[in-house]
UniProtKB/Swiss-Prot annotation:
Gene Ontology molecular function terms on file: rRNA binding; structural constituent of ribosome
Subunit annotation: Part of the 30S ribosomal subunit.
Pfam families linked: Ribosomal_S8
Function, in words: One of the primary rRNA binding proteins, it binds directly to 16S rRNA central domain where it helps coordinate assembly of the platform of the 30S subunit.
Single GO BP term: translation
GO cellular component: cytosolic small ribosomal subunit
Similarity comment text for this entry: Belongs to the universal ribosomal protein uS8 family.
Organism: Pyrobaculum aerophilum (strain ATCC 51768 / DSM 7523 / JCM 9630 / CIP 104966 / NBRC 100827 / IM2)
Keyword Membrane carried by entry: no
Protein name (database record): Small ribosomal subunit protein uS8
Length: 130
């Protein structure tokens, strides 16, 4: 089976596991972008421990879920966003100010929209979570 967007697949696996009330989600297949996105989610308290298992087929992550995710999803297409436009995208994808995060891939790595605004850099929108 060919995966066209590994990050989107990972986010949907997390969302489905949260909906049915599971305590953990198995993310497979994985890549570095998925890992860095999971680290941002972990930093903001949306997921718990992230464990990598090398199964000889590309590996997989076991993510501990904390039950704090109401909605999570990829942003497709991946829009380029300038520093000054982040607030507009925040209003479009998040339910209210100060609730949830946008995940942005920047030249300085994958980070939340909050960090991107602090550093005054833009990037490409990857996902939203609240």
């Amino acid at each position: 089976m060919v995966m066209l967007d590994i990050l989107s697949n990972a986010l949907i696996q997390i969302k489905n596991a949260e909906i049915v009330g599971k305590k953990q989600a198995v993310i497979w297949p994985v890549n570095k972008l998925t890992y860095y996105t999971l680290r941002v989610l972990q930093r903001y308290g949306y997921v718990g421990e992230i464990e990598y298992i090398d199964d000889g087929k590309g590996g997989k992550y076991i993510v501990q879920l904390l039950g704090k995710i109401n909605d999570i999803g990829p942003i497709r297409p991946r829009y380029p966003v300038k520093y000054r436009e982040i607030v507009q995208w925040e209003q479009k994808f998040l339910p209210a100010r100060q609730i949830g995060i946008l995940i942005i891939s920047t030249s300085q790595g994958v980070m939340s929209h909050i960090e991107a605004k602090e550093r005054k850099i833009g990037g490409v929108l990857l996902a939203y979570v609240y």
